[in-house]
């Protein structure tokens, strides 16, 4: 009789563990509700039509208007880029 009770309890624990694993794996990949992608400070970045270069005096030139130069690593050539939106500028934060 004692053997049957222990076997039953082991089986019950095993079923509970399997149920929890199955429940977790089903909910881990679910697409549930997400937070809205819209924020109070929305911003977009886009490339301008011009490129920029670094001169021998280490200053960047070639961008005009609201565009600024973006480059990778030590590269002396880059692309001009512009921010659009209501994101605060560095001057406003200081």
Curated annotation (Swiss-Prot):
Disulfide bonds join 48-67, 52-69, 63-80. The keyword Glycoprotein applies. Glycans are attached at residue 74. GO terms for cellular component: extracellular region. Residues 1-28 form the signal peptide. GO terms for molecular function: C-X-C chemokine binding. It is found in: Secreted. Keywords: Disulfide bond, Glycoprotein, Secreted, Signal. Salivary chemokine-binding protein which binds to host chemokines CXCL1, CXCL2, CXCL3, CXCL5, CXCL6, CXCL10, CXCL12 and CXCL13. This is Evasin P1086.
């Amino acid at each position: 009789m004692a053997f049957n009770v222990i076997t039953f309890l082991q089986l019950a624990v095993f079923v509970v563990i399997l149920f929890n694993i199955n429940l977790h794996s089903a909910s881990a990949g679910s697409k549930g509700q997400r937070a809205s992608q819209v924020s109070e400070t929305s911003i977009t970045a886009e490339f301008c039509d011009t490129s920029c270069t670094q001169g021998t005096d280490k200053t960047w030139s070639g961008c005009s208007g609201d565009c600024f130069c973006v480059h990778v690593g030590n590269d002396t050539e880059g692309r001009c880029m512009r921010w659009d939106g209501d994101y605060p500028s560095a001057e406003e934060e200081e």
